[in-house]
Regions:
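Short, charged juxtamembrane terminal tails flanking transmembrane helices
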Residues: 3, 539-547
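ABC-family ATPase nucleotide-binding domain "signature/switch" substructure
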Residues: 448, 452-453, 463-464
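Polytopic alpha-helical membrane proteins, predominantly small-molecule transporters/carriers
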Residues: 53, 179-180, 188
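The alpha-helix within a helix-turn-helix
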Residues: 175-176, 450
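Short alpha-helical segment that forms part of, or immediately flanks, the ligand-binding pocket
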Residues: 172, 447-448
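Glycine-rich helix-loop "coupling/hinge" segments at transmembrane-helix boundaries
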Residues: 210-235, 486-515
Length: 547
């Protein structure tokens, strides 16, 4: 009983701490942005903001369009039709999520640059100058739209496929009795019913696009996120960067509002208690192979081409890529990611336990606050953490001097604790979501039975909840760990001096124009990401009616 009396306040305190931790960078950004910087702001208004807002809006619209057309189209084909290779494509279509946007950008620029692989191949049949004229200009806004869109479309694909698979056959049959063809059924029935799922997928695509800095900067697109980075790095103005960050936060709020608007009046029930799911229509002959080609092309461009390039460069340049630095960077990445995963799981578990033990009120509010972190672009989050972290480091140094001890230096920044904190804030929504879904499958009767047997809340959690939550905990741990490995913006700003991770070392190689030397580091990130994507795909397929 004493343990229970201590446990509940402790868990509640951890839940409040988690919410406060997520809210801290937002609060800090607003406070820093309130500092006057008239000279810099006039410069931003005249020379930075117009292009940054224009490029950001164009990139969001363009990437969203590519992701919507590719994701919804392929999801409809594999959900509603049978054709050669469909079973394989079900597994392959989500795999571009394993390729970070910045790695995709580095790969394609390297492939299509003068004297790159594509140019050298074309010169086998064409004069060098004619071959050069055929190369597309990827360091441009259209290039960024295509590259980022082709690796982010699986967000739309996964959400749309889940909806298409669950649609009742009755709606399509009713439309066909009224003379509607297959295309009209898709346009007027299937697509509107999938609108809420498409809104969720597009919101994730937009948030990931806003978070990107590596691809946009490398491809010459001056987004708001890139402008924040250059304002802080080149002009040394934290206030100016914070003011630009506030604009990004407003944009994030607008995207979330649009996502909720897109999910309005969502159809959550079918016309009967056990709906008959829509059977798949067989595509044979040329139609089947065209469907296969339409689904295989995004996989080829978004996953297979980057993967083969990284494999080739890693083997071809093995003496350069397989040096001690890459393994040191891998160790740093794994260390930061492991620590962040453990802390995020602990805080996520405390947050959901607090709402289960006493639903509603401030506990539910705290749980909702923890979901904000994933919506924060990593660079904005890092800027918001920078001032509090440095303030704590300075306070520790002052306290050490007051005690007559030697100066400890930058404890949080120098140890990597700032990086781990940023990871926890950004990805805390993942374990919270996984564990909330896991707890929803555990009836409250189990808790009542444990109490009637004299077991306290901690005993029930240890003996009942945790064993049943193992799949949710494992899934959350895998996703958080890999997301931490891939995170570039926050790591770039908060990493300790002279410490690199796999993501930042790739960025440094690309900045020096020698991305091939970082191919093995990129390959390690991709290899670590394939497993979680395949794991998520395994649990997203739903049996349908016979073809």
């Amino acid at each position: 009983v004493n343990v229970t009396r201590i446990a509940e306040p402790a868990v509640s305190a951890l839940a409040v701490f988690a919410a406060a931790l997520v809210a801290l960078p937002v609060f800090a950004i607003v406070v820093i942005a309130a500092q006057p910087a008239p000279d810099l702001w006039s410069h931003l208004l005249d020379y930075v903001l117009p292009q940054a807002v224009r490029d950001t809006a164009a990139l969001l619209i363009g990437v969203g369009s590519v992701a919507l057309l590719t994701g919804a189209g392929t999801a409809w084909l594999v959900s509603s039709h049978d054709f050669p290779g469909r079973g394989l494509l079900l597994w392959l279509l989500p795999l571009p999520l394993a390729i970070p946007t910045y790695i995709a950008a580095y790969v394609y620029v390297d492939l299509f640059e003068p004297l790159g692989l594509v140019h050298r191949t074309l010169t086998l049949w064409l004069p060098p100058r004619d071959a050069l004229a055929l190369l597309p200009s990827l360091r441009s806004l259209p290039g960024a739209i295509l590259i980022v869109g082709i690796v982010l479309y699986p967000y739309v694909y996964l959400s749309a496929r889940a909806t298409f698979q669950l649609q009742s056959a009755e709606f399509a049959e009713a439309a066909r009795t009224l003379g509607a063809g297959r295309w009209n059924v898709f346009r007027r029935i299937s697509l509107p019913m999938a609108r809420p799922a498409l809104a969720v997928g597009l919101a994730l695509v937009a948030l990931e696009t806003l978070n990107d800095i590596g691809a946009s900067e490398y491809l010459g697109v001056r987004t708001l996120t890139v402008s924040i980075f250059t304002t802080w790095l080149n002009r040394g103005s934290l206030a100016g960067a914070a003011q630009l960050s506030c604009l990004v936060l407003v944009m994030v709020g607008g995207l979330i509002a649009l996502e909720r608007y897109g999910r309005r009046n969502a159809v959550t029930e079918f016309s009967s208690e056990s709906p008959r799911l829509m059977p798949r229509t067989p595509f044979t002959g040329i139609k089947g192979w065209l469907a296969f080609a339409a689904c295989a092309l995004p996989v080829l461009l978004g996953f297979i081409v980057p993967l083969l390039f990284l494999l080739h460069q890693s083997v071809h340049r093995a003496p350069v890529t397989m040096d001690a630095a890459v393994w040191r960077d891998a160790f740093n990445s794994v260390t930061f990611a492991t620590l962040a995963t453990l802390v995020a799981l602990g805080l996520g578990l405390a947050t959901i336990l607090a709402t289960r033990w006493r639903p509603g009120g401030w506990r539910s509010f705290s749980a909702n606050i923890t979901q904000m972190g994933y919506a924060l672009p990593g660079l904005v989050l890092a800027l918001g953490l920078l001032a509090p972290v440095l303030a704590i480091d300075n306070a520790l140094s002052t306290f050490a001097s007051w005690l007559g001890l030697s100066q400890p230096g930058l404890v949080l920044m120098g140890s990597g604790a700032a990086v781990v904190t940023a990871y926890v804030i950004r990805f805390l929504a993942v374990p919270t979501g996984f564990l909330r879904a896991g707890f929803e499958r555990i009836p409250f009767d189990y808790d009542d039975s444990a109490r009637s047997a004299g077991a306290g809340q901690m005993t029930a959690m240890r003996r009942i909840h945790l064993p049943l939550l193992r799949p949710a905990l494992l899934g959350a741990a895998i996703v958080v760990f890999v997301d931490c490995l891939k995170e570039l913006p926050a790591t770039l700003l908060l990493r300790p001096l002279n410490v690199e991770t796999l993501a930042t070392s790739i960025y440094q190689y690309a900045s020096r124009g020698s991305f091939e030397d970082g191919a093995l580091a990129a390959l390690l990130i991709v290899a670590a990401s394939i497993g979680p994507v395949a794991w998520l795909t395994r649990f997203s397929d739903i049996p349908q009616g016979p073809a």
